[in-house]
Amino acid sequence: MDSQLVNPPSAFNYIESHRDEYQLSHDLTEIILQFPSTASQLTARLSRSCMKIDHCVIEYRQQVPINATGSVIVEIHDKRMTENESLQASWTFPIRCNIDLHYFSASFFSLKDPIPWKLYYRVCDTNVHQRTHFAKFKGKLKLSTAKHSVDIPFRAPTVKILSKQFTDKDVDFSHVDYGKWERKPIRCASMSRLGLRGPIEIRPGESWASRSTIGIGHSDADSEVENELHPYRHLNRLGTGILDPGESASIVGAQKAESNITMSMGQLNELIRTTVHECINSNCKASQTKSLK
């Protein structure tokens, strides 16, 4: 039976944080959100419930001169994710634009973990000095609990522009996409029997991915297995020039032998005899005696 979202306790009805002033910063700076009290969280934890954000409203009220320029970027991060993947939604709007930002969560979290959502802001391309108290932020948070998580229909973030000199063409907002999933087939000996039609069932030594055509394409799985079983099956598609291995080892060896200077045993003996004779003649000639005058 599907779990239904229960009516949250009164403590979970739009918990409001204080409307606080924040200093201008070019780096991500946290906006403090007020979450349910520890006692309320403990009550929900004892009932073995999980929790999600139904609705989050971030109110931005500027306090800068009318000739101030720049953009404010507000981001919601989920700290259960790695640092470079934690961003969930973001908004960009002019620094002089009073605006309400609306966010709807699409996931539950366990109360056994710290509350994962963090809210940050930063200002870019501005002519206002850093550390100036440029605006006030206020957060409103509505949460709900469930006995266990259920699929939540996606609701896109949105905005409500309060300054008349700005329109929807002056703001932007975005939300992350669903995580990508690629099924990885289990390696097994009988994966060569692929793509069978009819009712899908697995046999001993097989995997669901090897028998079905869901997820990874049949051709991909087939080619991966066939490449291992028959690595040379597609060589006939190549031209003869590519397949020609060149001269055989015996021909190459014979050609090398022919390229060397060769002589018979008799010729070698004659060469040695002549060389020795020349050496003797040149070293054994009697020296001419000098006459005494």
From Swiss-Prot:
Q: Which UniProt keywords apply?
A: DNA-binding, Host cell membrane, Host endoplasmic reticulum, Host membrane, Host microsome, Membrane, Phosphoprotein, Transport, Viral movement protein
Q: Which Pfam families match?
A: Gemini_BL1 (PF00845)
Q: How is it modified after translation?
A: Phosphorylated.
Q: What GO molecular functions are on record for this protein?
A: DNA binding
- Location in the cell: Host cell membrane; Host microsome membrane; Host endoplasmic reticulum membrane
What InterPro entries is this protein classified in?
Answer: Gemini_BL
Superkingdom of this protein's organism? Viruses
Biological-process GO terms, alphabetical:
transport of virus in host, cell to cell
Example GO CC term: the record gives:
host cell endoplasmic reticulum membrane
Key word Membrane present in the record?
yes
Coiled-coil stretches, from where to where?
none
Topology of this chain in the membrane: Peripheral membrane protein
Subunit composition and interactions: Binds to dimeric supercoiled plasmid DNA.
The task this protein performs is described as: Movement protein involved in the cell-to-cell and systemic transport of viral genomic DNA. Begomoviruses use 2 proteins to transport their DNA from cell to cell. The nuclear shuttle protein (NSP) shuttles it between nucleus and cytoplasm and the movement protein (MP) probably transports the DNA-NSP complex to the cell periphery and facilitates further movement across the cell wall.
Q: Which family does this protein fall into?
A: Belongs to the begomovirus movement protein BC1 family.
Official protein name in the record: Movement protein BC1
